[in-house]
A protein has these predicted regions:
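Hydrophobic alpha-helical transmembrane segments of multi-pass integral membrane proteins
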Residues: 166-183
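Short hydrophobic/aromatic, small-residue-rich stretches within specific transmembrane helices
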Residues: 46-50, 171-175, 197-201
Length: 242
């Protein structure tokens, strides 16, 4: 019964994140931290759930011709090698919780401070900037189990490289690819997902299916962003201080 309730929480997280083009890796980690999952299971479980959720979102965005692959490729190609390197690195439990807690707090701050720029024109994306950001986000993705979209999205918007809707469409395949590579590195390093991942994955997929459609058609992003920011901030504090 507890596993089913926990799966429903994963599904709810996936739904909320999918409304803004994200998979939910940061909140998956937050939930597992609250439930005191072993640290060697948290990262691979979060990455696997990212893959499930982002696969559907990527398919839906691509089917609607919303993914700007030319803009995505420099970010993606730079991120994959560093995501693999990050996945190879296994931190001890205290250091992992410290790093992940800081990542969650940073993600919460980004979500809270992010502003929509629908009416402003996009700027050209410089190759050096795209590769630098892609490499940095990829490394953090592989190291912590965060797909990277929660950092990529606000950067794209803040730098005027993409509109919010374009950013959502770019984030899903970025998260998918980096999560696949990061999971490969984590499993090579001896980490494996929790035994109940299949149940959590079904819930995450259902949430992604609903959330992506809701986000594309109806829901304002503002309230979802602040709610998720509060969850991530609380989880980051819990990891760092308790």
């Amino acid at each position: 019964m507890a596993d089913i309730m926990f799966a429903l929480l994963f599904g709810a997280v996936s739904l909320l994140y999918a409304t803004v083009g994200q998979a939910g890796g940061t909140a998956f980690l937050a939930l597992m931290a609250f439930a005191s999952f072993p640290s060697n299971e948290m990262r691979p479980t979060a990455l696997l759930l990212n893959i499930v959720a982002a696969s559907y979102s990527t398919w839906l965005f691509n089917r609607g011709s919303l993914v700007d692959w030319a803009k995505l490729m420099p970010l993606l190609l730079a991120s994959l090698p560093t995501a693999l390197v990050g996945g190879f690195i296994v931190l001890d439990e205290r250091l992992y919780k410290t790093v992940t807690g800081l990542v969650l707090l940073l993600a919460a701050a980004i979500l809270a401070l992010r502003r929509a720029r629908d009416g402003e024109p996009d700027r050209p994306t410089p190759l050096w900037g795209a590769t630098s950001i892609g490499a940095a986000v990829g490394f953090v993705s592989g190291l912590t189990g965060v797909g990277g979209g929660v950092f990529l999205a606000p950067l794209l918007i803040a730098l005027h490289w993409a509109s919010p809707k374009q950013t959502a469409a770019l984030s899903a395949p970025f998260i998918l690819a980096n999560s696949v590579v990061g999971l490969a590195g984590a499993m090579y390093a001896g980490q494996t997902p929790t035994a109940d991942t299949w149940l959590f994955a079904l819930a995450a997929l259902a949430g992604a299916m609903i959330g992506t459609i809701v986000g594309l058609r109806w829901l304002s992003q503002t309230m979802t962003r602040y709610m998720l920011g509060a969850i991530l901030g609380a989880a980051g504090i819990q990891l760092l201080f308790f």
